[in-house]
Amino acid sequence: MTTSSIRRQMKNIVNNYSEAEIKVREATSNDPWGPSSSLMTEIADLTYNVVAFSEIMSMVWKRLNDHGKNWRHVYKALTLLDYLIKTGSERVAQQCRENIFAIQTLKDFQYIDRDGKDQGINVREKSKQLVALLKDEERLKVERVQALKTKERMAQVATGVGSNQITFGRGSSQPNLSTSYSEQEYGKAGGSPASYHGSTSPRVSSELEQARPQTSGEEELQLQLALAMSREVAEQSSESVQTARGSKEERLRRGDDLRLQMALEESRRDTVKVPKKKEAKACCKPGSHSQQTTLLDLMDALPSSGPVTQKTEPWSAGASANQTNPWGGTVAPSNITDPWPSFGTKPAASVDPWGVPTTASTQSVPKNSDPWAASQQPASNAGKTTDAWGAAKPSSASGSFELFSNFNGTVKDDFSEFDNLRTSKKPAESGASVPPQDSRTTSPDLFESQSLTSASSKPSSARKTPESFLGPNAALVNLDSLVTKPAPPAQSLNPFLAPGAAAPAPVNPFQVNQPQPLTLNQLRGSPVLGSSASFGSGPGVETVAPMTSVAPHSSVGASGSSLTPLGPTAMNMVGSVGIPPSAAQSTGTTNPFLL
């Protein structure tokens, strides 16, 4: 510690200077080096405090008023004031403008040392620069912004240097001081250039100066800390690299395992599919005896279930062995009635009632397999066909099958459940409710119920008829007229009809307004149409009263005709007038209510 610094500290204690004043006195001391940047930064930060600002400015103005041998006080005060204007509070520049005359007077500062050197030139030049800056507001703003940015940047650098504990060389008891004074200036002032190290960036130099260790022990400590920190950083980086590499290798290994597993699964599926395709191709060859469909191939892949029991479902496709196909074709009996066979079984024979049997059968197929024709009784039982909708015929053999018969209760009727739902009456009662008619006559009305076979005449043929199956709706459909061939017309006993003409059907008295169309035989057998025309236009012809009367309640004759023959008087009138037989027939069936 020099003598000047000891004397300065003694004055600070005696005069009871504040902290801000002590710092200003330290920055503007008479020592042969310039103020440090860190000290000027602390003073600039104190300018934002009102109390410290007044103390700082009072001490600065006091230092500017020195003269003579204390020219360093003046020069350092101008340097500190320039720094405070650029980085301190704005009130510093305002107060400097107010007291600008004090700065302008320093342009005439004179001091010549004992060696004859003019030391006042530095003060004069500095005062001129400061006055020019205070007068130019735009320049002051630009300089202030730039200085603030530099201050912030240097503060960040100083923080980084302090945290990293970077050493910049061996320390010594003599601090490396930086100053803004050039060697030429100090040469003129008689200073030793070796004692002053000029620097273009005094702030960086001051930061480095503070970071340098002062003793050898501190230097060793900083070196050990730096080595430990560098080793820790290297280990962390190596661990992070190894961790990243290991995670990457793990991901690659997992991806390879997953792809390998997928490839194995795909190959296993291919090996399962290839034999199936080969079997399907072999089955589809022309010379193959066992042709299977793709659906059966898929069903073969399923595990085998137990033996399939026969179904009693009335609507199932398979039928029992004692049943015959009602549509004419004979089907070979089969134990398997499930349309979806189990695994490992051969496909059953086709039970399609509309197709031709594919399997070879020892039973001969009858030539006449028309399901709508009248049933015939062949010699052999194998070729029997049964008309499901035809008229009932006595069955002498047990091989015939009647769809609606009950077989005296031995076999359960397929439609008995539906018949029980429709009516609670017995089949005999429902059959008795239908009005009986002679089986030889044809029903004139399509909405009349069909005649039923008498139970007394055929006691052994107790069966279900379509009428009993349909119940009360039997009158809506004439099944015999739709399925069986019409019965041949009975011989007409009407003497007025032409030979070979068909017997006219009874006319409904409520439909007399509709003309009766002539048949083809009537058109062929009728005489010239002129007689009928003359009948309508001849003079003196009176309206012929009906010679017959409709008797709806009369018993029907054996011939099936419901018309009463004309008497002799009517025959004479017809002969005298010349009415043709067809006209006489239509006249004889006139409605008596329309006279």
From Swiss-Prot:
Ubiquitinated. Residues 494-593 are annotated as: 3 X 3 AA repeats of N-P-F. A 1,2-diacyl-sn-glycero-3-phospho-(1D-myo-inositol-4,5-bisphosphate) binds at R8, K11, R25, N30, R63, H73. Residues 12-144 form the ENTH domain. The modification Omega-N-methylarginine is found at R170. The modification Phosphoserine is found at S173, S192, S195, S443, S526. Residues 164-254, 267-289, 305-396, 423-469 are annotated as: Disordered. GO terms for biological process: embryonic organ development; endocytosis; in utero embryonic development; Notch signaling pathway. It comes from the Eukaryota. Residues 218-237, 255-274 form the UIM domain. SMART domains: ENTH (SM00273), UIM (SM00726). GO terms for molecular function: lipid binding. The modification Phosphothreonine is found at T465. Pfam families: ENTH (PF01417). GO terms for cellular component: cytoplasm. Residues 449-460 have a biased composition (Low complexity). Sequence repeats lie at residues 313-315, 325-327, 338-340, 352-354, 370-372, 387-389, 494-496, 508-510, 591-593. Residues 313-389 are annotated as: 6 X 3 AA repeats of [DE]-P-W. Residues 164-183, 197-216, 235-245, 306-337, 358-367, 374-384 have a biased composition (Polar residues). It is found in: Cytoplasm. Belongs to the epsin family. Plays a role in the formation of clathrin-coated invaginations and endocytosis. Binds EPS15, AP-2 and clathrin. Interacts with UBQLN2. Interacts with ITSN1. This is Epsin-2. It comes from Mus musculus.
